[in-house]
UniProtKB/Swiss-Prot annotation:
PANTHER family: N-ACETYL-D-GLUCOSAMINE KINASE, ROK (REPRESSOR, ORF, KINASE) FAMILY. HAMAP family: GlcNAc_kinase. This is N-acetyl-D-glucosamine kinase. Pfam families: ROK. The gene is nagK. It comes from the Bacteria. It comes from Shigella boydii serotype 4 (strain Sb227). Zn(2+) binds at H157, C177, C179, C184. The keyword ATP-binding applies. Pathway: Cell wall biogenesis; peptidoglycan recycling. ATP binds at residues 4-11, 133-140. It catalyses: N-acetyl-D-glucosamine + ATP = N-acetyl-D-glucosamine 6-phosphate + ADP + H(+).
Length: 303
């Protein structure tokens, strides 16, 4: 059995998957925020419960926001303060007496989708998250590409391409990002960025779901906004696709629930790609809230 943990600032979610990659059981508990020992206990108790329930010693994979292992082997995860700065993988491997695998949550999202029954035919899968922020992951032949610093797939911290400034106007604001840089595409293409663009052009403060509702009602202003957003997404994604050249792009996050993202994006890409480039298949993520657990569990499918 494959145990996958999706760990965030408020909850630890465990999903148990069989050899057919089907979910057999899941359980959630609150994330201890102040005590590392309590955090380790919470994970180990869930593993023990799963072992007893299924009569086996399942493999353990963990998805967590942040950098799973820094150069000294410790975790960097600002949203999980009890474990940040600790050698989480090593400590859990020792306590559980088994190989614990750890990766960031965006890579686990991408891995979950790459192992979808229909998507396993594609060698190179790119996961793109358009949610509170912008991120993602790259999966090659069923394995995540992490890079030396575990920042592969941090697409949101690419800067706006020059064509975007031509499109939006050379006086378009280069917003300061939480990473300290200016002009990161996360600030324009995330759910928050989607709302900011609307406010910037129309001087009305609406949230993304409200704008999308207006779009669906045929509101001309909302439709013009969505056209502009999709053009900006296409020119930004075009740069990424030129470097990565994936077979499949799977889009997750809150904005993936807006059908125009996946149905209209492909037609806008060719003018931003090399003439010989082929537009990859673009699909909405299929596994929703279970994706983090699935991807973490499937870290052990990559042997």
């Amino acid at each position: 059995m494959y145990y996958g943990f999706d760990i965030g600032g408020t909850k630890i979610a465990l999903g148990v998957f069989d050899s057919g990659r089907q979910l057999q059981w899941e359980k959630r508990v609150p994330t201890p925020r102040d005590s590392y020992d309590a955090f380790l206990d919470a994970v180990c108790e869930l593993v023990a419960e799963a072992d007893q329930r299924f009569g086996c010693r399942g493999s353990v994979g963990i998805g967590i926001p942040g950098m799973p292992e820094t150069e000294d082997g410790t975790l960097y995860a600002a949203n999980v303060p009890a474990a940040s700065g600790k050698p989480l993988r090593a400590d859990l491997s020792a306590r559980l007496d088994r190989d614990v695998r750890l990766d960031n949550d965006a890579n686990c999202f991408a891995l979950s989708e790459a192992w979808d029954d229909e998507f396993t035919q594609y060698p190179l899968v790119m996961g793109l998250i358009l949610g509170t922020g912008v991120g993602g992951g790259l999966i090659f032949n069923g394995k995540p590409i992490t890079g030396k610093s575990y920042i592969t797939g941090e697409f949101g911290h690419m800067r706006l391409p020059v064509d975007a400034l031509t499109m939006m106007g050379l006086d378009f604001p280069l917003r300061r990002c939480g990473c300290g840089q200016h002009g990161c595409i996360e600030n324009y293409l995330s759910g928050r960025g989607f709302a900011w663009l609307y406010q910037h052009y129309y001087h009305q403060q609406l949230q993304a779901p409200e704008i999308i509702a207006l779009y669906n009602q045929g509101d001309e202003q909302a439709r013009a906004h969505v056209e502009r957003y999709l053009d900006l997404l296409a020119v930004s994604l075009g740069n990424i696709l030129t470097i990565v050249d994936p077979d499949l792009v799977v889009i997750g996050g809150g904005l993936s629930n807006f059908p125009a993202i996946t149905t209209q994006l492909a037609d806008r890409l060719p003018c931003h790609l090399l003439p010989v480039a082929r537009v990859p298949r673009i699909e909405r993520a299929r596994h929703g809230d279970a994706g983090g657990m699935r991807g973490a569990a499937f870290l052990h499918l990559t042997d």
